[in-house]
From Swiss-Prot:
PANTHER family: UPF0178 PROTEIN YAII (PTHR35146:SF1)
Cross-referenced NCBIfam families: PRK00124.1
Protein's name in the database: UPF0178 protein PFL_5989
Annotated HAMAP family: UPF0178
Domain of life: Bacteria
InterPro entries on file: UPF0178
UniProt organism field: Pseudomonas fluorescens (strain ATCC BAA-477 / NRRL B-23932 / Pf-5)
Similarity field: Belongs to the UPF0178 family.
One Pfam assignment: DUF188
Amino acid sequence: MRVWIDADACPKAAKDQVVRFALKRQFEVVLVAGQAQIKPAFACVRLIVVPSGPDAADDYLVEHAVPGELVICSDVPLADRLVKKGLAALDPRGKEFDAQNMGERLAVRNLFTDLREQGQVSGGQAPYGDREKQAFANALDRILTRLARQA
């Protein structure tokens, strides 16, 4: 099994949680980034730095991840591409992307993008705290268990 991470936008705490699961459950973690990052010093972790460019890391993830694997990403359009390819996708706050919720997630994302562009909404997400870390760990455990059963 392999877990891919869109590393540029993923909080360090979430990346660290995936590595802890990987050490315990014996799977590979692939960090895909558009810029250099510090790679955790474990054999189960690989870092791939893609050439810079719009959506280069996203395109790499869509091209290389295969059904039965999990991708951690915050990017809703990327998650849509992954789900359509048959992959499991999870955001660092513990919300799984799936065929049933992608339409709604895309609509909400597009609405907030439009509102931000019009100056009607400012700011971003709440800080990544203990509640988000716990929700992510719970969802990660649930999805990894499901994928292991399907393998």
